[in-house]
């Protein structure tokens, strides 16, 4: 009818979708988590690529922690010196409030580092990989690249097998509830284990 509009959702045509993505697709834990939280936002962000990326302060702090801990463990450098290097080489201009939090969290980094060193001393897994990119490619009607970045993998080769531990650093509070797994939630560590095993 003239001047009418139907706001009901109509599915995307499958062949149009395959052509749009060029029959290939990237998946990660964060994109899957985004889908479970809001499929429409996932569609806008990961399919149509309409997201305008702005680094939030939380992401900045996460990058700071990863940078400092990796280099402190590998190169045995001072935590305070590494924090200064990160701040000076990062383009973000910190507000006074952000500087206050960075200084406060920097002191906590020393405690975290000491705790990690104690854990390493009591572990039999002596080999480490940092910020390891892992991916598994599944070919079919659509080629899917399943990828992830694992903060740290500790491993030891024994006989014909390899024992691994996957570590993911969190700067915020995260609930890990295995009861959520059947619903596709709290999947980060199982996904990383799958990627590490199959890549």
What are these regions (language model features)?
Residues 1-71:
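C-terminal, charged and often intrinsically disordered regions of DNA end-processing helicases
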Residues 36-47, 80-84, 154, 160-171:
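Active-site-adjacent bridging/hinge elements
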Residues 48-49, 53, 70, 74, ...:
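Short, well-ordered loop/turn and helix-capping segments at boundaries between secondary-structure elements
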Residues 10, 25-28, 36-37, 58-62, ...:
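Active-site-proximal structural scaffolding
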Residues 127-197:
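Non-catalytic protein-protein interaction segments used by genome-maintenance enzymes to assemble
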Residues 64-139:
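A non-catalytic, helix-rich entry segment at domain boundaries
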